[in-house]
Amino acid sequence: MAEPSVKKSKLTESDWISGLADDLLLQILSKVPTRESVFTSRMSKRWRNLWRHVPALDLDSSKFPHESDLEDFFDSFLQFDGNLKIERFKWIYNVEEHCDPEFVSRIDHVVKRGLKDLTILSKVNIEDDSVRMPVSLYSCATLVNLTLYSVVFDAPRAQLVSLPCLKTMHLEAVKFDGETILGTLISSCSFLDELTIITHDHDELGDVSVRSPSLRRFKLESMREDYDECEDPNVEVDTPGLEYMSITDYQSESFIIHNISPCAKVNIDVVFDAEDEDSVIHDFITAISTVRELTISARTLEMIHDYVESETELVPQFSNLFCLHASFSESSWEMFPTFLGCCPNLHSLFLEFDCLPEKEEINLSLVPHCFESSLEYVQLKVPITVSETSSKMELAIYFVRNCSVLKKLMLNESFGNVINKVRKIPKRSEGCKIAMPKPLHENVSHGSSLLPLICGFIPKILDQ
């Protein structure tokens, strides 16, 4: 029997797509930038106006030759179907002449169209023409996800602030015309699940007050370049349900944590610059001592090291700590046995050193309690430039000979010249394996088309 011709047996990509129902096509088109959605109008008569019914707008000002073209397109899209809900709206906004009343009016129209997902990324560099948000955004009853960059919030009337469905909020370089607006905004979100705040120079953020019983994830990062002129805002956190908190490159006078879940994972990179610095450090360490998983930066540990030395204070017990990721600098590396001594139930340990001293300067006589009872996994990372073979051996010996329940010691490539010697060290734990990670290979994808995009979205849509 003759084989069917390729032309008859194999549907083209456009034929296969066109066989889908309109509702499914609209959901697929809502996942791509509007510019690409418009291009589908050329495929066939059926597709000519399909993009006009997509419940999403994804715009980039730089893709339009003239600013007036973008404005005309925006207005015509909304006017074509006055009842169309705009569930997702994204605008990369970069114009030379910003007209605030017209911009606010357009965003206001979108907010009132049943909006669920809003992203505004402003790249306007005109100080006098701040990109402001409409007051209606404060009371958008349908909004679920909010992402804003370099925009301004005007002070609202308190009774207008209500975002009952908002679950994720990402604010970067956002200015507030009032020091209490951010706190009011956060507390108005009854179901807020994830909050990200990234501060920039001159954003006039005021204090960061995060009070939310529903919040599970909180990320705070500083992009400020000159701490001498403008420190990061003070922070106050009261989030009993918080499961993850990340503080990156932060420096403030005060960081108060009233309440945090004992199951929380915390990533800390913060230092303090306050008159009563010792009290601030003590309260902060005590507040995070209840968490289950902790990642702590070298400069934060250096601050703690200086505090302990100057005040002859003891680091509080981290009795609940199960997993620790810690980075040590040259000036504070020797405190790591002492710090581990405060973690009696530690199970997994990841240590990173920016250097190692000479063997004669190493004193690892203190054996923490967790070495005897709970520590099962250790990973050591030393820069490849560190050449002190004897120092690396001392570090490895410290764990191999003292950890009675250790199951695995992972060493990075810097230990390549001593790995065989380390494996011959008599082990306190007979079942301990000593290994080095294999190099990672990047996955490279080739080519792209609309078909794999659609195939990826269909299962997700059908599951909804």
Curated annotation (Swiss-Prot):
Keywords linked to the UniProt accession: Leucine-rich repeat, Repeat
Recorded superkingdom: Eukaryota
Spans of repeat LRR: 96-122, 123-150, 152-178, 197-222, 223-249, 273-298
Native organism taxonomy: Eukaryota, Viridiplantae, Streptophyta, Embryophyta, Tracheophyta
Listed name of the protein: F-box/FBD/LRR-repeat protein At1g80470
Keyword hit for Transcription regulation: no
Disulfides per UniProt: none
Domain spans labelled F-box: 15-62
Residue ranges of every copy of the FBD domain listed in the record: 359-413
Organism: Arabidopsis thaliana (Mouse-ear cress)
